[in-house]
Regions:
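Conserved structural core of kinase catalytic domains
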Residues: 70-116
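Activation segment/activation loop of eukaryotic-type protein kinase catalytic domains
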Residues: 138-173
């Protein structure tokens, strides 16, 4: 709920500002801490498993491969209940989804498209170079700045650093 106060495992206090959206695993909220806005992914009951929490703890400990990933930063685990979530950077509003491109809601230059492709490839290469794999590639998880081709890759809570099977999602078939 808007106005709800949550404390992270590291002691930071976040206030829920508004619901941004929902997916198969949970809801994403705009939250605020010390005057800065972040995104909070809050898991639904069926997705808030011990396995998913272990995956998140590993991802947070390893750190982001680079700034193109909206990487989990810290966990929010209330003292009561089985549900939890994590904090990540908030995507700037000027970034558009690949779906926006496919539906022609944005019309970047050919140069920007090439830079977007290069930056996506470079981001995944950096992820793989640190021994990880991204397990949720879908059109809704890739964003780009239509002015310069910078990219943001979200939904990184299913990244794996071992040979485990995918978590709760399988990406785009």
């Amino acid at each position: 709920r808007n106005g709800t106060l949550l404390t992270s495992e590291s002691g930071n206090r976040y206030e829920v500002v508004s619901l941004l959206g929902a997916g198969g695993q949970g809801e994403v909220y705009d939250v605020q801490c010390n005057g800065r806005h972040y995104a909070l992914k809050w898991y639904f009951k069926g997705s808030a498993t011990a396995r998913q929490k272990n995956i998140l703890e590993t991802i947070i400990a390893k750190g982001s491969p680079d700034a193109s990933f909206l990487w989990p930063m810290e966990l929010i685990v209330p003292a009561q209940g089985d549900l939890y979530g994590y904090i990540m950077p908030l995507r700037p509003k000027n970034y558009k989804s690949i779906v926006d491109l496919m539906k022609k809601r944005v019309n970047p230059s050919f140069y920007t498209l090439c830079r977007t492709a290069f930056n996506l490839t470079r981001g995944y290469q950096k992820l793989h170079a640190m021994g990880a794999k991204y397990q949720d590639i879908s059109f809704g998880n890739l964003f780009f700045n239509p002015d310069n081709g910078d990219v943001l890759i979200c939904d990184n809570d299913n990244v794996s650093f071992d040979n485990s099977k995918p978590g709760g999602v399988l990406g785009t078939p």
